[in-house]
A protein has these predicted regions:
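Charged, compositionally biased, marginally structured helical/coil segments
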Residues: 1-147
């Protein structure tokens, strides 16, 4: 079952349950995925679907932070509610320990000793953590390890 089919099923359930917040969040996700399909003029692959979800996740986080900074807690809460719905369809995020293990093994594998090797380490780590860790968190961890 594709992600779009799962989202459509969840949307039907949310409509039956009259869960307006969940329904709206699912509609936004479906709209983003369908927009990406139309842009590419073909069905999305799993990794492309994941990229769309990650992009939407990042947008929700940034919007919630901006609303909080602007003193608009109600809109920030709405964005965070959408983020919780979106998280249900994303792969489980790596915890700090697992991410550190992956980074440490990549540093050892590449033979990195300084910040000059940052790009090579990131190139080794990112395919392993794709969709399961935020790139900025990975980047920060690699910088700390190489410093």
């Amino acid at each position: 079952m594709s992600l779009i089919e799962r989202l459509e099923g969840e949307l039907r359930e949310a409509m039956r349950a009259r869960d307006d917040d969940r329904r709206d969040a699912l509609r936004l996700l479906l709209s983003s995925l369908r927009g990406a399909e139309k842009e590419l003029q073909r069905p999305l692959h799993d990794d492309e679907e994941l990229q769309v979800l990650q992009r939407e996740r990042k947008r929700r986080i940034e919007a919630a932070e901006a609303f909080r900074a602007g003193g608009r807690a109600e809109q920030a809460d709405a964005e965070e509610a959408e983020l919780r719905v979106l998280a249900e369809f994303m792969p489980e995020q790596l915890d700090e320990e697992e991410l550190e293990e992956i980074v440490d093994s990549a540093i050892a594998e590449v033979g990195a000793t300084s910040m000059r090797d940052f790009g090579r380490v990131m190139a080794d780590v990112m395919p392993q953590v794709s969709g399961r860790a935020d790139g900025s968190v990975v980047s920060q961890l690699v910088r700390e390890k190489l410093a």
